[in-house]
C-alpha cells in the first residue's frame, strides 16, 4: 500500500513540475513575462494615434489576447500591424521575441534604423517592413535568419549595400528591396523573385556586373586668352556640345544595358518555356508536382478522399510520399486563356500573396490535360463544416472563436484588397471558403482563383461566380465586381457566424421566409436579435457584441456599394474603433436610406423598399453557385 502511495505521489509531483514548467516558460526569474516586457517596449517607441495597441498592458501576464498579436503553443509567433498609421521607431527589444515567425509592419510611418537584434529571431519566416520610412543600412544580421522565406523592405529610405549575408539564407522565396537609396553590388541570393528597381546606384550581381562602370567626371580645359575670336568660342561651344552629347549617350546606353539586364533577369523569375514540363523546375518555395505523384497521393483521385466540391473544381485529401497531408484542388477548366504561361503567371501571383490569414499555396501541377493546385491540409476543416456539419462529433464554435474568425477573415481580405499588387477580389466570401488551422485561426481560401484587379479597373464578367445569398446586388444586376463585392459577402459571413446557418440553405424551415439578409434586417428593426443566435451556442454569447456585429454586417450589406465601408474600416470596427459613429451617421440619413437603383431595364411604378430577394429573382445573369460539400 505504501508503495502505491509513493508511486501516486511521485506521478503527481511530476505532473506538477511539468505544469509549472509550461506555465512559467516565458517568465523571468522575477516572475515577469519577458514577451510582455518586449512587446511593451515596442509599443512605447511607437506613436499610436488610433490606440490599436491600447490593451498592451505591462501588468498583463499573457500577451496572447492582445490585439494584433498571435500565439502558437503559448508563445508570441506573429506580430501583425499593417496600415495602422504607426510612427516612431522600432525598438531593438523586438529581438527578445524569439518565437516570432511573422512580423508585418507594412504601410505605416515608422522611422529610424532596422534593429540589428532582428537577427536573433531564428524562427522568423516572414519579415515585412515595406512602405515605411526606415533609414540606415540593411542589417547584416538578417543573414542569420535561416528560416526566412519572405523579406520585404521596399519603399523605405535605406542606404548602403545589400548585405552579402543574405546569400546564406537558402530558403528565400521573395526579396524586395525596391525603391530605397541602396548602392553597390547585389549578393547572389537564392530567392526566385528579387526586386531591386528604384535604386539608381545598384549595379547588379557581383558575378556579372562591373560596379566601376560609373563614368568619371568630365573635365574640360580651362579657358585661356581669346586668340582666335569667334572661332575659338565656336570651338569651345562645339566641344561642350560634343561632351554633353557623349555624356547623354553614355547615360542612355548604360540605362539601356541595365534595363536589358533587368529584363533578362526578370524572365528568369519564372519558368523558361523550354523547361515548362520539367518536374524539377520550381518557383521559390513552390514545388512542381507530377501528375503521377498527386494521383498516387489521392489514391487515383478516389471519391472517398473528396473534401469538397466547388465551381472551380474538386478538392481531395492527399498523402504525399513523405507522409505530409495536403489538400489537392483539381481544377475543372484546363483551357485557361493564355495557356501554360498564363496559368504559371497566376500561380506566381497566388504564391506571393502571403499573410497569416490567407491559404498558402504549397505547389502545383500543370500539363496539357491537367491544372492542379496543392495546399496545406487544414485539420479543422471549414467554418461551414464547424458550424453545422459536426459529423465527427466536434463541439460547435463558441462565441469567442466566432469573433476571432470574423477578425481574422477581415485581416486576410484587407491584405488582398489593399496590400497585394495587383489587388485581388475574392468574389465568393462565405463560411465554406474560410478554413481553420490547428489554432482555429481563420484562413481565407480560394482567393487566388478570383479574377485579379488592376489598380485602375473593376472586373466585369457576363457570368456571375459566387454563391446565392452572398452575391452583392450590383454584381447580380450588372456583372461588375469590386472590393465592395467582397465587403457584401463578408457581411453575409458575419450573419452565418451569428446564426450558424448557410445563407444558401436559409428559408427551408417554416418560420423563415425570404433570404437571410432580409430576415435579419426585419428582426433588427423589431429588436429581436436573440432570435438570430445559433442554438448551439446555448445562450453563451455577449449581447453587446451581438448588437455590434449585426450593425457591422448591416453596414457591409448596404445595397449601394459606395455606402459600404472598406475592409480596413470593417476590421477597425470589429476591433471597436469607429462603429458607433458610422452607425449613427447611417441612422441619421447620411448613410443609406433611399432604395438602390433597379437593375438595367426595370422600371419602378412607385417607391418601395427593395429586398435582396428581389435581386435574386430579377437577375438575368448566369449564376454559377459554388458550394463545397465538406470541410477543406
From Swiss-Prot:
Residues of this chain annotated as glycosylated in UniProt: 96, 131, 155, 181, 210
Presence of keyword Cell membrane: yes
One record GO biological process: defense response
Residue spans, topological domain Extracellular: 26-238
Catalysed reactions, semicolon-separated: L-seryl-[protein] + ATP = O-phospho-L-seryl-[protein] + ADP + H(+); L-threonyl-[protein] + ATP = O-phospho-L-threonyl-[protein] + ADP + H(+)
Lineage, broadest ranks: Eukaryota, Viridiplantae, Streptophyta, Embryophyta, Tracheophyta
Topological relation to the membrane, as annotated: Single-pass type I membrane protein
Listed name of the protein: Protein NSP-INTERACTING KINASE 3
Expression tissues: Expressed in seedlings, leaves and flowers.
PANTHER family: LEUCINE-RICH REPEAT-CONTAINING PROTEIN DDB_G0281931-RELATED (PTHR48006), PROTEIN KINASE DOMAIN-CONTAINING PROTEIN (PTHR48006:SF90)
Subunit structure: Oligomer. Interacts with geminivirus nuclear shuttle protein (NSP).
GO molecular function: ATP binding; coreceptor activity; protein serine kinase activity; protein serine/threonine kinase activity
Functional description taken from the UniProt entry: Involved in defense response to geminivirus infection.
Gene responsible for this protein: NIK3
UniProt keyword list: ATP-binding, Cell membrane, Glycoprotein, Host-virus interaction, Kinase, Leucine-rich repeat, Membrane, Nucleotide-binding, Phosphoprotein, Plant defense, Receptor, Repeat, Serine/threonine-protein kinase, Signal, Transferase, Transmembrane, Transmembrane helix
Species the sequence originates in: Arabidopsis thaliana
Stretch list, region Interaction with geminivirus NSP protein: 415-495
Amino acid at each position: 500500500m505504501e508503495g502505491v502511495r509513493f508511486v501516486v505521489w511521485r506521478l503527481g509531483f511530476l505532473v506538477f513540475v511539468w505544469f509549472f514548467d509550461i506555465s512559467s516558460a516565458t517568465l523571468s526569474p522575477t516572475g515577469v513575462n519577458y514577451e510582455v516586457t518586449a512587446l511593451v517596449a515596442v509599443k512605447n517607441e511607437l506613436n499610436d494615434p488610433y490606440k490599436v495597441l491600447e490593451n498592451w498592458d505591462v501588468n498583463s501576464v499573457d500577451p496572447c489576447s492582445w490585439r494584433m498579436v498571435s500565439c502558437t503553443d503559448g508563445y508570441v509567433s506573429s506580430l501583425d500591424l499593417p496600415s495602422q498609421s504607426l510612427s516612431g521607431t522600432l525598438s531593438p527589444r523586438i529581438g527578445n521575441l524569439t518565437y516570432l515567425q511573422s512580423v508585418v509592419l507594412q504601410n505605416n510611418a515608422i522611422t529610424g534604423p532596422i534593429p540589428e537584434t532582428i537577427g536573433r529571431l531564428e524562427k522568423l519566416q516572414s519579415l515585412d517592413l515595406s512602405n515605411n520610412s526606415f533609414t540606415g543600412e540593411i542589417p547584416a544580421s538578417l543573414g542569420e535568419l535561416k528560416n526566412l522565406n519572405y523579406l520585404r523592405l521596399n519603399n523605405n529610405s535605406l542606404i548602403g549595400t545589400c548585405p552579402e549575408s543574405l546569400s546564406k539564407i537558402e530558403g528565400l522565396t521573395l526579396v524586395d528591396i525596391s525603391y530605397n537609396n541602396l548602392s553597390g553590388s547585389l549578393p547572389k541570393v537564392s530567392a526566385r523573385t528579387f526586386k531591386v528597381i528604384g535604386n539608381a546606384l545598384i549595379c547588379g550581381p557581383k558575378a556579372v556586373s562591373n560596379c566601376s562602370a560609373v563614368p568619371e567626371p568630365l573635365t574640360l580645359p580651362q579657358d585661356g586668352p581669346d586668340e582666335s575670336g569667334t572661332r575659338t568660342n565656336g570651338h569651345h561651344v562645339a566641344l561642350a556640345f560634343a561632351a554633353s552629347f557623349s555624356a547623354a549617350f553614355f547615360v542612355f546606353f548604360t540605362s539601356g544595358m541595365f534595363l536589358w539586364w533587368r529584363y533578362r533577369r526578370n524572365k528568369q523569375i519564372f519558368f523558361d518555356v523550354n523547361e515548362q514540363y520539367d518536374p524539377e523546375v520550381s518557383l521559390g518555395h513552390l514545388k512542381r508536382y507530377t501528375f503521377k505523384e498527386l494521383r498516387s497521393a489521392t489514391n487515383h483521385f478516389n471519391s472517398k478522399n473528396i473534401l469538397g466540391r466547388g465551381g472551380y473544381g474538386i478538392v481531395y485529401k492527399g498523402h504525399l510520399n513523405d507522409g505530409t497531408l495536403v489538400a489537392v484542388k483539381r481544377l475543372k477548366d484546363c483551357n485557361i486563356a493564355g495557356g501554360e504561361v498564363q496559368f504559371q503567371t497566376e500561380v506566381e501571383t497566388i504564391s506571393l500573396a502571403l499573410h497569416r490569414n490567407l491559404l498558402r499555396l504549397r505547389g502545383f501541377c500543370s500539363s496539357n490535360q491537367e491544372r492542379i493546385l496543392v495546399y496545406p491540409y487544414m485539420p479543422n476543416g471549414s467554418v461551414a463544416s464547424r458550424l453545422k456539419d459536426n459529423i465527427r462529433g466536434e463541439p460547435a464554435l463558441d462565441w469567442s472563436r466566432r469573433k476571432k474568425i470574423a477578425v481574422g477573415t477581415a485581416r486576410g481580405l484587407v491584405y488582398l484588397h489593399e496590400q497585394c499588387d495587383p489587388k485581388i477580389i475574392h468574389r465568393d466570401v462565405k463560411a465554406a471558403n474560410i478554413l481553420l488551422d490547428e489554432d482555429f485561426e481563420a484562413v481565407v481560401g480560394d482567393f487566388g482563383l478570383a479574377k485579379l484587379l488592376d489598380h485602375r479597373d473593376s472586373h466585369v464578367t457576363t457570368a456571375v461566380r459566387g454563391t446565392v445569398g452572398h452575391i452583392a446586388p450590383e454584381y447580380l444586376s450588372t456583372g461588375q465586381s469590386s472590393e465592395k463585392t467582397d465587403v457584401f459577402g463578408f457581411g453575409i459571413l458575419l450573419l452565418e457566424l451569428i446564426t450558424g446557418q448557410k445563407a444558401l440553405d436559409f428559408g427551408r424551415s417554416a418560420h423563415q421566409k425570404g433570404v437571410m439578409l432580409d430576415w435579419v434586417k426585419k428582426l433588427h428593426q423589431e429588436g429581436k436579435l436573440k432570435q438570430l443566435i445559433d442554438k448551439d451556442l446555448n445562450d453563451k454569447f455577449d449581447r453587446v457584441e451581438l448588437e455590434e456585429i449585426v450593425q457591422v454586417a448591416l453596414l457591409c450589406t448596404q445595397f449601394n456599394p459606395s455606402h459600404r465601408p472598406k475592409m480596413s474600416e470593417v476590421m477597425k470596427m470589429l476591433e471597436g474603433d469607429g462603429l458607433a459613429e458610422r452607425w449613427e451617421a447611417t441612422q441619421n440619413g447620411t448613410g443609406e436610406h433611399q432604395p438602390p437603383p433597379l437593375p438595367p431595364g426595370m422600371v419602378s411604378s412607385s417607391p418601395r423598399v427593395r429586398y435582396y430577394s428581389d435581386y435574386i429573382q430579377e437577375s438575368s445573369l448566369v449564376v454559377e453557385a459554388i458550394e463545397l460539400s465538406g470541410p477543406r
